[in-house]
């Protein structure tokens, strides 16, 4: 695993964070050291796939990056005639994802596409995964994407939505942000790295509250919506059609 040192030296002109070749190269290390509970979420995606994925259906991993969630789901799918479609708009991520998927043998076919998830049709889905992806979409595009997902899910299909959250209570919000930064420092990131990455993400990642997510998912049509995992200001929700 290549160590993430992208923000370890001062950057004179710090642009917006993008999922380019450099990020794709270090992404597994970056996300493990940056997102508390990430491994638990990936493991549980496999457990949810085992419960929810049905025969003759599709599974979508929207914003699949290097394929961790796709592989977790794939390892736990035991139903016949299931296909996984992973989509990411970063070509470097897609190339590495394809290599990663090809390294593991499975009877479950996987197709990895380089595309904008807003333009991809969702159909005959028993499971859709949005793992730390929605927060990078413009807020005005989120309802349309979730509506498309809902309409493409079969009855009793599940959406797994993992996100970084913000909190309406300012003191709690600041506390959880501070704890997250402490988590990153404990994982070897310096103050400079934490600060520069935060600045790079400011205009790219726009977070919502848990309540905003719940209301939006229910308004789209999901019958059951619940937070199933949280660590500091990161977590994951399930929404069942």
Swiss-Prot record:
<dbReference type="GO" id="GO:0016743">
    <property type="term" value="F:carboxyl- or carbamoyltransferase activity"/>
</dbReference>
<feature type="binding site">
    <location>
        <begin position="116"/>
        <end position="117"/>
    </location>
    <ligand>
        <name>S-adenosyl-L-methionine</name>
    </ligand>
</feature>
<comment type="similarity">
    <text>Belongs to the class I-like SAM-binding methyltransferase superfamily. Cx-SAM synthase family.</text>
</comment>
<keyword id="KW-0949">S-adenosyl-L-methionine</keyword>
<dbReference type="InterPro" id="IPR005271">
    <property type="entry name" value="CmoA"/>
</dbReference>
<dbReference type="GO" id="GO:0002098">
    <property type="term" value="P:tRNA wobble uridine modification"/>
</dbReference>
<feature type="binding site">
    <location>
        <position position="38"/>
    </location>
    <ligand>
        <name>S-adenosyl-L-methionine</name>
    </ligand>
</feature>
<protein>
    <recommendedName>
        <fullName>Carboxy-S-adenosyl-L-methionine synthase</fullName>
        <ecNumber>2.1.3.-</ecNumber>
    </recommendedName>
</protein>
<comment type="function">
    <text>Catalyzes the conversion of S-adenosyl-L-methionine (SAM) to carboxy-S-adenosyl-L-methionine (Cx-SAM).</text>
</comment>
<feature type="binding site">
    <location>
        <position position="198"/>
    </location>
    <ligand>
        <name>S-adenosyl-L-methionine</name>
    </ligand>
</feature>
<dbReference type="InterPro" id="IPR041698">
    <property type="entry name" value="Methyltransf_25"/>
</dbReference>
<feature type="binding site">
    <location>
        <begin position="63"/>
        <end position="65"/>
    </location>
    <ligand>
        <name>S-adenosyl-L-methionine</name>
    </ligand>
</feature>
<feature type="binding site">
    <location>
        <begin position="88"/>
        <end position="89"/>
    </location>
    <ligand>
        <name>S-adenosyl-L-methionine</name>
    </ligand>
</feature>
<dbReference type="Pfam" id="PF13649">
    <property type="entry name" value="Methyltransf_25"/>
</dbReference>
<dbReference type="GO" id="GO:1904047">
    <property type="term" value="F:S-adenosyl-L-methionine binding"/>
</dbReference>
<feature type="binding site">
    <location>
        <position position="131"/>
    </location>
    <ligand>
        <name>S-adenosyl-L-methionine</name>
    </ligand>
</feature>
<comment type="subunit">
    <text>Homodimer.</text>
</comment>
<dbReference type="InterPro" id="IPR029063">
    <property type="entry name" value="SAM-dependent_MTases_sf"/>
</dbReference>
<keyword id="KW-0808">Transferase</keyword>
